[in-house]
Amino acid sequence: MTDSMQILIVEDEMLLAMDMEAMVEDSGHRVLAEAASLQDVEALPDDLNPQLAFVDIHLAHDSNGLDVCRYIRTHWPDALIVFVTANVSKIPADFSGAHGVIAKPFSHAGVVNAINYLANGVFAPPPSMPRPASLIPSPNLEARWMKTVA
């Protein structure tokens, strides 16, 4: 087991958010906060400083995950951002700066494996374990880890 990560969950469907929270905790990590919209994320304390954020694309109050991603990159630039969505085709080629995506529907094991892989890379980049099939990485992920190692 790697060190424990501090994780933000941005998901407007309460049952999915609760499921994600259980998976995070089952992985030995901690949920710092949950949010259902960009407005909820903007209301979080500036010193929250998550290490990983799971972000849905379609959110409450006519907000979207792409805007949340930009906000997180500005306010918590060290956070890894992973979209969790059934709408993978809605993610732009540059991932809006995010580090990867997990497609819905997802399996418990798939999310747990992705969390552990990302945690391994956060604390000792690049990860020493193989990337799980559940995580579709963006070019930003490898670039971040190569920059950290250099």
PLM regions with names:
Residues E34-L52:
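Acidic, metal-coordinating helix/loop segments flanking the phosphotransfer/catalytic sites
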Residues E13-A33:
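Two-component/phosphorelay signaling modules centered on CheY-like receiver
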Residues E11, T85:
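Conserved acidic carboxylate
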Residues S107, N116:
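Receiver (REC) domain switch/active-site region of two-component response regulators
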Residues L66-P77:
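Short amphipathic alpha-helix used as the core "switch/output" element in two-component signaling
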Residues K104:
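A Lys-centered signature of the CheY-like receiver
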Residues N113, N120-A150:
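CheY-like receiver
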Residues D56-H58:
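Active-site residues of response regulator receiver
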